[in-house]
Each structure stands twice: as structure tokens, then as C-alpha cells.
UniProtKB/Swiss-Prot annotation:
Descriptive protein name: Putative pterin-4-alpha-carbinolamine dehydratase
Enzyme class: lyase
Keyword Lyase: yes
Annotated source species: Pseudomonas fluorescens (strain ATCC BAA-477 / NRRL B-23932 / Pf-5)
Keyword Lyase annotated: yes
Catalytic activity: (4aS,6R)-4a-hydroxy-L-erythro-5,6,7,8-tetrahydrobiopterin = (6R)-L-erythro-6,7-dihydrobiopterin + H2O
Stored NCBIfam families: PRK00823.1-1 (NF002016)
Sorted UniProt keywords: Lyase
Length: 118
């Protein structure tokens, strides 16, 4: 199996399957610092990234925008002073798809080289 951070997203339609109960623990183990949150009955992956100031947080947000556009899969991004909260879920299936785990792993890769991390 390809490492999540090297995989690419596939097109996700409204009839695509959500991650199964069997797949979930296998996938979450590959992104151990991410939390599973449930909002309005929708399972999501979420992680907070800390930065030294707003400028660095904004640069990380913009970098996330670039990889999201390239993969055609977009997160919820909350940019605050010194902090960016990244939330992944698949809107079309109202839950988690393998794409969300791929992008969470790719987010961690971007964060490794992000300037100004705390």
C-alpha cells in the first residue's frame, strides 16, 4: 500500500463509500496526531498547528490552499494569530473518505517544512 503522504486523491462522488469501521483504525494509525471530531453527525479529521505569529500561520494556510487545489480536495481552514486549525472531511458523502486521510498526511508533510512553527 502506498504511504498516505505519497498517495493522490480520487474523485469522490455522492455515492462513494465512507471509510469503513475496519479501515478507520488502520488509517488513523498513519496520522496519529489527528483527532476525529463529529459535527452535526459528520465525522471529520482535525488538527491544530501552532506558529510564532499570524504571518507564518497565513503562509501555512496559503500552502495548504495550493496542495488542496492541486488535489481537488479542500479542507476547512481556520487561521488565527499563531494558529491554524485544519479540518478534513468529504462534503459529498458527509463523512470520511480515504482522500481525507491522504490529505491529512499531506498536511503533516507541508507542516514539517513550514516556517515559524512552534
Amino acid at each position: 500500500m502506498t504511504a498516505l503522504n505519497q498517495a493522490h486523491c480520487e474523485a469522490c462522488r455522492a455515492d462513494a463509500p465512507q471509510v469503513s469501521d475496519e479501515e478507520l483504525p488502520v488509517l488513523i494509525k498513519q496520522i496519529p496526531d489527528w483527532n476525529i471530531e463529529v459535527r452535526d453527525g459528520v465525522m471529520q479529521l482535525e488538527k491544530v498547528f501552532l506558529f510564532k505569529n499570524f504571518k507564518f500561520a497565513l503562509a501555512f494556510t496559503n500552502a495548504m490552499g495550493e496542495i488542496s487545489e492541486a488535489e481537488g480536495h479542500h479542507p476547512g481552514l481556520l487561521t488565527e494569530w499563531g494558529k491554524v486549525t485544519v479540518t478534513w472531511w468529504s462534503h459529498s458523502i458527509k463523512g470520511l473518505h480515504r482522500n481525507d486521510f491522504i490529505m491529512a498526511a499531506r498536511t503533516d508533510e507541508v507542516a514539517k517544512t513550514a516556517e515559524g512553527r512552534k
